[in-house]
Amino acid sequence: MKFFGWMQNKLNGDHNRTSTSSASSHHVKQEPREEFSDWPHALLAIGTFGTTSNSVSENESKNVHEEIEAEKKCTAQSEQEEEPSSSVNLEDFTPEEVGKLQKELMKLLSRTKKRKSDVNRELMKNLPLDRFLNCPSSLEVDRRISNALSAVVDSSEENKEEDMERTINVILGRCKEISIESKNNKKKRDISKNSVSYLFKKIFVCADGISTAPSPSLRDTLQESRMEKLLKMMLHKKINAQASSKPTSLTTKRYLQDKKQLSLKSEEEETSERRSSSDGYKWVKTDSDFIVLEI
């Protein structure tokens, strides 16, 4: 707010100076007219009066010069007095206040631009009134029309150019994205086609066909066949040995069991024989009281 007050004081001081200087000069110029207005024109035509009028005019011109110099001195003194006060006021501001003042000035400038645009619109609206009221000044009306139209056309052209640039940039970016996507899709398709064609070649190509792998030599085939035969023989032997080992174990078990049973039977028979031999001849009593020798 201090800054705005200082600006207003400066502006008001300049206007007052200009008005006072103009008023003083106008007043000085009007004084001789008022003095000579009462005198008759015949007296001025005489030579004696003409000489006196010249001397009076010279004195008045000197007085005017003196007054102008005095006013210049006064203005210089007032400017010298205002300059330190303005510097003091500027020193009192902080950087935050300066930033706020800059923002306010930007707002004022934007408002002035808006006002100018509003004025141009009003001029465009009030064109028939201007033509009607200022009929002799048709050239000025035409100039105003041309200026307003040029301003409007320039602003519209600038906006159109900006819009066109934006749309062009958007279109170019989209085209780049589409081209990149199409390239990636083509690469994927080529890879899939190559893989499928390679598989078909592998499946359907004959031994003497266009196969990329080299054909095996006779030595390799012979060596492979010999090794395969040996491996097969080894496997067969192992399998037969395992199969034969299983029934032998069973037969041995059965044989041993049979041996045990036979041994048990033989032992039982021997024991029975021994018992019979140990008993010898026995007397057996019967109901008929006959003695029978049982062997």
Curated annotation (Swiss-Prot):
A motif (IGT motif) lies at residues 42-48. It comes from the Eukaryota. GO terms for biological process: gravitropism; positive gravitropism; regulation of growth. Residues 59-74 have a biased composition (Basic and acidic residues). Keywords: Growth regulation. Expressed in the endodermis of inflorescence stems and hypocotyls. Highly expressed in hypocotyls and root tips of young seedlings. Disruption phenotype: No visible phenotype under normal growth conditions. Roots of plants lacking LAZY2, LAZY3 and LAZY4 exhibit a negative gravitropic response, and grow upward in the opposite direrction of root gravitropism. InterPro entries: LAZY (IPR044683). Residues 1-36, 51-89, 260-280 are annotated as: Disordered. The keyword Chloroplast does not apply. Belongs to the LAZY family. Involved in the regulation of root gravitropism. Functions redundantly with LAZY3 and LAZY4 in the control of root gravitropism. Functions redundantly with LAZY1, LAZY3 and LAZY4 to control plant architecture by coupling gravity sensing to the formation of auxin gradients. Involved redundantly with LAZY1 and LAZY4 in the regulation of both shoot and root gravitropism. Mediates gravity signaling in statocytes downstream of amyloplast displacement, leading to the generation of asymmetric auxin distribution in gravity-responding organs. This is Protein LAZY 2. It comes from Arabidopsis thaliana. The gene is LAZY2.
